């Protein structure tokens, strides 16, 4: 698909940054097997490109978070749920997600995966949005850091209607991905 005008991060810029991240991860792996845990749906495009840049044996696992609103004794709260994760005891683990915003979901996943006693566990994200953070969590690797609270579309991230994941570049709504409103026909 062709590039959209106003891309904040071009396909070439993303590719160069992902290649650099792959080299950094490879250096730290020292040739050891790396278990990559990819968060669905957002992390798969970034993870695929990143894994191809890692010079070490890689095993890929996928997890999906489910966030539910739970009410108990009249108090509402949000809870994060994951299915059973892979067996990671003694393994080097890299959790890959597209965006680190509040950090709540990633922190929960890191704690949950840490229960299986991996040798090491690290977090890689394409976009780090520290201004949105609600927990004390920093990524070990990040592609780009942004102060924008805009919705990002492309390179695996979808617009509200689910489209745009296939775009090679990454754009925020402020940079030209805002969709035109479609008026329905009057009956």
Features from the language model and the residues they span:
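PRPP-associated nucleotide enzymes
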Residues: 1-187
């Amino acid at each position: 698909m062709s590039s959209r005008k106003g891309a904040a991060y071009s396909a070439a810029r993303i590719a160069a940054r992902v290649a650099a991240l792959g080299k950094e991860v490879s250096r730290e792996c020292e040739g050891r097997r790396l278990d990559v845990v990819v968060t669905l749906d957002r992390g798969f495009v970034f993870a695929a490109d990143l894994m191809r840049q890692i010079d070490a044996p890689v095993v890929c696992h996928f997890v999906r978070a489910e966030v539910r609103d739970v009410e108990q004794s009249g108090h509402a709260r949000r809870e994060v749920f994951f299915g059973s994760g892979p067996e990671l005891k003694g393994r080097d683990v890299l959790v890959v997600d597209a965006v680190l915003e509040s950090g709540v979901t990633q922190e929960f996943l890191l704690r949950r995966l840490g229960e299986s006693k991996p040798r090491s566990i690290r977090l890689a994200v394409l976009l780090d949005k520290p201004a949105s953070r609600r927990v004390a969590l920093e990524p070990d690797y990040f592609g780009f850091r942004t102060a924008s609270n805009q919705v990002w579309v492309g390179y695996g991230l979808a617009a509200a209607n689910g489209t745009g994941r296939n775009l090679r570049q990454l754009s925020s709504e402020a940079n030209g991905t805002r969709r035109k409103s479609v008026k329905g026909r009057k009956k």
